[in-house]
């Protein structure tokens, strides 16, 4: 079904193909990942960098003027913000996952020619190379997608943070 389903969080209509493009074959949301080039975290980080301008200079002054040592930590904050704002990943369907270098899902899904892991006869398997926590989440997510359908899963998780 390629019809219009509903608005996403950016108020754009989403089709099944667009939903598939936003989710990795494992079921995790690439768009919500901090490393995604078109993700909210990168977009908000770029905006915050723009709004902060040359705050480096002021952070040093505020440390003295306000007597608050928290401003000593601004360089660390800025380093993290710069990292979040950098172009990093185009999503697991477009390139090898940059978050999990040993991820076995992309190669497997291409080999098996499936959209999501739950569609595989061998699901769940040990080809993912995920740690225990991610493996459990992967199984749970794919079981939900299998039982509820991708549209319902996407809609249900649309406004939920990626990192919960």
Protein language model features and the residues they cover:
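Cysteine-centered metal-binding/redox modules
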Residues: 13-164
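Short, Lys/Arg-enriched N-terminal segments with co-localized hydrophobic residues
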Residues: 1-13
């Amino acid at each position: 079904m390629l019809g219009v389903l509903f608005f996403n969080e950016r108020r754009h209509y989403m089709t099944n193909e667009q939903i598939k493009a936003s989710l990795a074959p494992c079921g995790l949301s690439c768009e919500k990942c901090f490393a995604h080039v078109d993700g909210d975290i990168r977009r908000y980080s770029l905006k915050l960098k723009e709004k902060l301008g040359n705050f480096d200079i002021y952070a040093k002054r505020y440390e003295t003027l306000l007597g608050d040592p928290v401003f000593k930590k601004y360089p660390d904050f800025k380093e993290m913000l710069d990292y979040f704002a950098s172009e990093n990943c185009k999503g697991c369907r477009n390139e090898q996952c940059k978050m999990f270098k040993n991820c076995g899902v992309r190669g497997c899904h291409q080999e098996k020619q499936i959209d999501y892991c739950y569609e595989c006869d061998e699901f769940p398997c040990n080809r993912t190379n995920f740690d225990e926590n991610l493996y459990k989440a992967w199984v749970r997510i794919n079981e939900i997608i299998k039982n509820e359908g991708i549209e319902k899963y996407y809609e249900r998780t649309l406004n939920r943070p990626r990192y919960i």
